[in-house]
């Protein structure tokens, strides 16, 4: 009889398979189960020679093969399939066993599973895993949350297989309930913003300087040696430069209709519910929706050719490229600032006590948004933990101050020439709104009071005191 294994994994799609192989590489024995026995058999045939893998065709045998407390990682489609799998496992589990959902589950679903399984004596962990296929195989960024009692038993496994940066694993305990999956979702939302900013930057360079895919790819490659060094800038350079066997640019064949799996929309909705102005992430989600209207956009382009105010390209190409680089970096700061504002707000609302600086360290390796920039964020939270946002931390204040002129020039060029830049323009608008002392929003309150008697606060009175004006007759104001 084979010895019991260290951990079990359910779901042998790409992410599941690569996580298993990563665990085996780090000396852990793994039991695997897939609803399709053929997939399990094929996986064992390809990778079972080490003896560290065991495959099973029934849930009961799978569970019985594990060392106690049993540690089971579920890597299947989010939603109802996860609940169905948990229900099928429960009859064979014992108090103290650990269930880990490593998929892209919505954090409120994870909160409910945490509560429900705690009643059964089962330790539930909602674990965000970022890095895609390559990260899962070579070292992902891992964000575990849920029942803290599970952490001592699973930490040796997941901190071993996680990406390592400066000798530190990109994996640490996040918080209770759905904290792990929420942090992963915000990561994905920030990723949406990063990608959209890169796309808009590409479009400005292409339109205003008439540059080729390869030329812009080379610019991105150069930028990747600067403060903008990141996985996504490097990936964008690689995609733009790549050629097929005939020497043609592969990127030129890709249809401009962008897909999404829903995590960006979740974060946009969560930001609105939390009252956090996460405008870049929201705009990046909307840009993908607009991209799906390909036929409508094609017709609209014929009906509305546009009336550009800027017809001539910039006089100094190199200076303009630097303006665009500054715009990208400034907008990236604002995007991350918004993301961390949401993390901070929801952490306060939920009582998670998230360590925001630690999150920046977890994201430095193995994940899609990994970048040198995250070190600056960690340092910022270490040096100025009381700051309302990244924007008010010393390093980022200086960057925004130094890059503001180039940022504005790049946005002016784009808008003046009819280039859609929803995230870059949103970033600049947020920056200007954030630093505005007296905004026009007083008129919102005046109008709400005019048509709905909602009341308003006065500039010359303490906050929290509300007043109503009889706008239609006496014009008298009184406290309500």
Curated annotation (Swiss-Prot):
Gene3D superfamilies listed in its UniProt record: 6-Phosphogluconate Dehydrogenase, domain 3, N-(1-d-carboxylethyl)-l-norvaline Dehydrogenase, domain 2, NAD(P)-binding Rossmann-like Domain
Q: Which GO biological process annotations does it have?
A: D-gluconate metabolic process; organic acid catabolic process; pentose-phosphate shunt, oxidative branch
Q: Which UniProt keywords apply?
A: Gluconate utilization, NADP, Oxidoreductase, Pentose shunt
| Binding residue positions for NADP(+) | 11-16, 34-36, 76-78, 104
The broad enzyme category this protein falls into is oxidoreductase
Q: Which residues are listed for substrate binding in this entry? A: 104, 130-132, 187-188, 192, 261, 288, 448, 454
Q: What GO cellular component entries does it have?
A: cytosol
Task: Kindly give the InterPro entries that the UniProt entry links to this protein.
Answer: 6-PGluconate_DH-like_C_sf, 6PGD_dom2, 6PGDH_C, 6PGDH_Gnd/GntZ, 6PGDH_NADP-bd, 6PGdom_BS, NAD(P)-bd_dom_sf, Pgluconate_DH
Molecular function as annotated in GO: NADP binding; phosphogluconate dehydrogenase (decarboxylating) activity
Its UniProt entry gives the catalysed reaction(s) as: 6-phospho-D-gluconate + NADP(+) = D-ribulose 5-phosphate + CO2 + NADPH
Q: What is its EC number?
A: 1.1.1.44
Give the metabolic or biological pathway: Carbohydrate degradation; pentose phosphate pathway; D-ribulose 5-phosphate from D-glucose 6-phosphate (oxidative stage): step 3/3
The residues annotated as the active site are 184 (proton acceptor), 191 (proton donor)
Leader sequence segment: none
Protein family according to the UniProt entry? Belongs to the 6-phosphogluconate dehydrogenase family.
Matches recorded under NCBIfam families = gnd, PRK09287.1
The task this protein performs is described as: Catalyzes the oxidative decarboxylation of 6-phosphogluconate to ribulose 5-phosphate and CO(2), with concomitant reduction of NADP to NADPH.
Oligomer status and interactors: Homodimer.
Q: What protein am I looking at?
A: 6-phosphogluconate dehydrogenase, decarboxylating
């Amino acid at each position: 009889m084979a010895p019991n294994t260290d951990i079990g994994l359910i779901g042998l799609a790409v992410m599941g398979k690569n996580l298993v192989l990563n665990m085996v590489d780090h000396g852990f024995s793994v039991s695997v189960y897939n609803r399709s026995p053929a997939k399990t058999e094929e996986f064992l045939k390809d990778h079972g020679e080490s003896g560290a893998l065991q495959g099973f065709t029934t849930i009961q045998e799978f569970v019985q093969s594990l060392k106690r407390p049993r540690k089971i990682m579920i890597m299947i489609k989010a939603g109802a399939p996860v609940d169905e799998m948990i229900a099928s496992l429960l009859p064979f589990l014992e108090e103290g066993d650990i269930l880990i959902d490593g998929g892209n589950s919505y954090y409120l679903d994870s909160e409910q599973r945490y509560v429900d399984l705690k009643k059964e004596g089962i330790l539930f962990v909602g674990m965000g895993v970022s890095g895609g296929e390559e990260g899962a195989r070579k070292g992902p960024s891992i964000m575990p949350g849920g029942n803290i009692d599970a952490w001592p038993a699973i930490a040796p496994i997941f901190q071993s297989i996680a990406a390592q940066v400066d000798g530190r694993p990109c994996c640490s305990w996040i918080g209770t309930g759905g904290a792990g999956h929420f942090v992963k979702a915000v990561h994905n939302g920030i990723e949406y913003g990063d990608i959209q900013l890169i796309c808009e930057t590409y479009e400005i360079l292409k339109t205003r300087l008439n540059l080729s895919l390869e030329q812009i790819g080379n610019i991105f490659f150069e930028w990747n040696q600067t403060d903008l060094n990141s996985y996504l800038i490097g990936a964008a350079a690689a995609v733009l430069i790549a050629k097929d066997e005939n020497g043609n640019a592969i990127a030129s064949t890709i249809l401009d209709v962008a897909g999404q799996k829903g995590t960006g929309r979740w974060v946009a909705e969560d930001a609105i519910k939390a009252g956090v102005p996460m405008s870049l992430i929201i705009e990046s989600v909307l840009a993908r929706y607009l991209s799906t209207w390909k036929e409508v956009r094609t017709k609209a382009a014929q009906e509305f050719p546009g009336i550009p105010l800027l017809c001539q390209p910039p006089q100094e190409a190199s200076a303009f490229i630097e303006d665009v680089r500054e715009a990208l970096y400034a907008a990236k700061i604002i995007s991350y600032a918004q993301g961390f504002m949401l993390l901070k707000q929801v952490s306060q609302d939920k009582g998670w006590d998230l360590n925001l600086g630690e999150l920046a360290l977890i994201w430095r390796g193995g994940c899609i948004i990994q970048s040198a920039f995250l070190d600056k964020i960690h340092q910022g939270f270490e040096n100025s933990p009381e700051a309302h946002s990244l924007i008010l931390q010393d390093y980022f204040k200086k960057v925004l101050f130094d890059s503001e002129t180039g940022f504005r020039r790049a946005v002016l060029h784009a808008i003046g020439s009819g280039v859609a830049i929803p995230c870059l323009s949103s970033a600049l608008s947020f920056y200007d709104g954030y630093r505005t002392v007296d905004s026009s929003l007083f008129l919102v309150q005046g109008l709400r009071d005019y048509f709905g008697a909602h009341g308003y606060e006065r500039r010359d009175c303490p906050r929290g005191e509300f007043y109503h004006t009889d706008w239609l007759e006496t014009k008298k104001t009184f406290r309500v």
